[in-house]
Regions:
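Function-dense linear segments that define catalytic or interfacial modules
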Residues: 111-196
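Conserved "right-hand" nucleotidyltransferase catalytic core of DNA-directed polymerases
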Residues: 1-131, 149-151, 161, 221, ...
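Interdomain boundary/hinge elements
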Residues: 2, 178-181, 185, 238, ...
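Conserved catalytic core of nucleic-acid polymerases
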Residues: 99, 106, 112-114, 190-323, ...
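C-terminal structured "cap/appendage" subdomains that terminate the fold
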Residues: 317-365
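Extended, hydrophobic alpha-helical segments in both membrane/secreted and soluble proteins
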Residues: 1, 161, 185-188, 207, ...
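Structured core elements
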Residues: 28, 106-108, 118-121, 125-130, ...
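Hydrophobic, well-ordered secondary-structure elements that form the walls
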Residues: 31, 117, 156, 189, ...
Length: 365
C-alpha cells in the first residue's frame, strides 16, 4: 500500500498538470469554487450550467459525467478525483486502521442503517473496497490470509438482483434464460436487438448489461445515455425494446408502484416491509424517488434477506462440523472466509450448497 500510495501521488500530479495545460491556467482542483469558472466561464462546457443552492457552479460527479463527451478535460478531472479518493480513503487510511493487538483491520457492521435491509460497514468501510478498476484490485490484493497455511476464499451470488426480479415478475423469457444457464446480458441483447444469441456483439452485450442493472434502479433515457455512448433518443428506443422483450417485467414494476400507493409499503420475499411515506407526495421529484424505491427495495431487500439466511446456515454447519475456518466479511452479495488450506475443498462445497439452497426462487441462485 505504501508503494501504491507513492505511485498514485505521482499519477495525480501528472493528471493535474495535464488538466492545467488544457485549462491554460493553474488552480485548486479540489475547490469547486475555482473549478466551476474554469469549466463554465472559460471553456463554456455547458449552455446552462447547473448551480448549487449558494449560486456556485455545480461540479458534482453526476454533473461532470454528463459533460464528459464535451471536452477531454472532464474525463481527466474525474480520473484525478478517482485517484485522489482511492489514495486518501483506502491506500493511505487502511494502514492506520490496523488494530495494534490483533494486527488486523476490523470493521463494524450495522444491521439497521440501510433502509433496504442490507448490512452496512464502517470504521473502516470494508464493503466499499473498489474492485472494478485495475487500481482498485491492487488495493484488494493488500488483504491477505494470516499465514501461509491459510487462504482467503470468497463466494458470491451471480446477478442475484436480476434473478430475484425475474422470479418476482415471472417473466417467462427472463426466467427461461436463467433456468437454461444462459448469459443473461447476452440473452437480453439477443432479444432486444433481434439477433441470434451467438451473434451478439460485445457492444450489444455491454448496452444490454447497463439496461439490465439500470432497470432495477429506474434508469431513464437520459441516465442511460450518460452511462453509454448512446444518444438520448437511442437510449429511449433501447429501453422501450427492453420492455417489449420482457413485458411481464414492466407490468410487475407498475403493480409494485400501485401496491405501494395503496398500502404505503412494499415487502421483500420474506415479508419484511419498507414503508414509503412519500409515495403519494404532490412533489413529482419526491414521489418519483419513492416510486423507484417501490421497485428497488423488494429486490435489494430480498437479496439482503437471502444472503443473511445463507450466513446463518453456513455458520451453523461450520460449527456442527468443527471447521477451523472463519467467516470474515459480508460484502453485499459476497462472503469472504479465512480457512486452513486443508479445509478449502470441504468449505467450498459447504458454502456453495448452502448459498444455493438459502431460498427457493423460480430460477437457481
Amino acid at each position: 500500500l505504501n508503494r501504491m500510495g507513492t505511485e498514485l501521488g505521482q499519477e495525480a500530479q501528472q493528471l493535474a498538470e495535464r488538466i492545467f495545460d488544457q485549462a491554460g491556467e493553474t488552480f485548486n482542483l479540489a475547490s469547486p469554487k475555482q473549478l466551476g469558472p474554469v469549466l463554465f466561464d472559460k471553456l463554456k462546457l455547458a449552455d446552462k450550467p447547473k448551480k448549487t443552492k449558494t449560486g456556485q457552479y455545480s461540479t458534482a460527479e453526476d454533473v461532470l459525467s454528463t459533460l464528459a463527451k464535451n471536452h477531454p478535460i472532464v474525463a481527466d478531472i474525474l480520473e484525478w478525483r478517482s485517484v485522489q479518493k482511492l489514495n486518501n480513503t483506502y491506500v493511505s487510511a487502511l494502514p492506520e486502521d490496523v488494530n495494534a493487538h490483533s494486527n488486523r483491520v476490523h470493521t463494524v457492521y450495522n444491521q439497521a442503517v440501510a433502509a433496504t435491509g442490507r448490512l452496512s460497514s464502517n470504521h473502516p468501510n470494508l464493503q466499499n473496497i473498489p474492485i472494478r478498476t485495475p487500481r482498485g484490485q491492487q488495493v484488494r490484493k493488500a488483504f491477505i490470509a494470516k499465514d501461509d497455511q491459510h487462504v482467503l476464499m470468497a463466494a458470491d451470488y451471480s446477478q442475484i438482483e436480476l434473478r430475484i426480479i425475474a422470479s418476482l415478475s415471472e417473466d417467462p423469457s427472463m426466467v427461461a434464460a436463467f433456468n437454461n444457464n444462459e448469459d443473461i446480458h447476452a440473452a437480453t441483447a439477443a432479444k432486444v436487438f433481434g439477433v441470434l444469441l451467438e451473434e451478439v456483439s460485445r457492444e450489444q452485450r455491454s448496452q444490454a448489461k447497463t439496461v439490465n442493472f439500470g432497470i432495477i434502479y429506474g434508469v431513464s433515457a437520459f441516465g442511460l445515455s450518460n452511462q453509454t455512448t448512446l444518444s438520448r433518443s437511442e437510449s429511449k428506443e433501447l429501453i422501450d425494446m427492453y420492455y417489449e422483450s420482457y413485458p411481464k417485467l414492466k407490468s410487475y414494476m407498475s403493480a409494485q408502484v400501485d401496491f405501494a400507493r395503496e398500502q404505503g409499503y412494499v415487502a421483500t420475499v420474506l415479508g419484511r416491509r419498507r414503508y414509503l411515506k412519500d409515495i403519494n407526495s404532490r412533489n413529482a421529484i419526491v414521489r418519483g424517488a419513492a416510486e423507484r424505491n417501490a421497485i428497488n427495495a423488494p429486490i435489494q431487500g430480498s437479496a439482503a434477506d437471502i444472503i443473511k439466511i445463507a450466513m446463518l446456515t453456513i455458520y451453523d454447519k461450520m460449527q456442527q462440523q468443527h471447521f477451523k475456518a472463519q467467516m470474515l466479511l459480508q460484502v453485499h452479495d459476497e462472503l469472504v472466509f479465512e480457512c486452513p488450506k486443508s479445509e478449502l475443498d470441504a468449505l467450498t462445497q459447504l458454502v456453495k450448497t448452502e448459498m444455493e439452497a438459502a431460498y427457493s426462487l423460480q430460477v437457481p441462485l
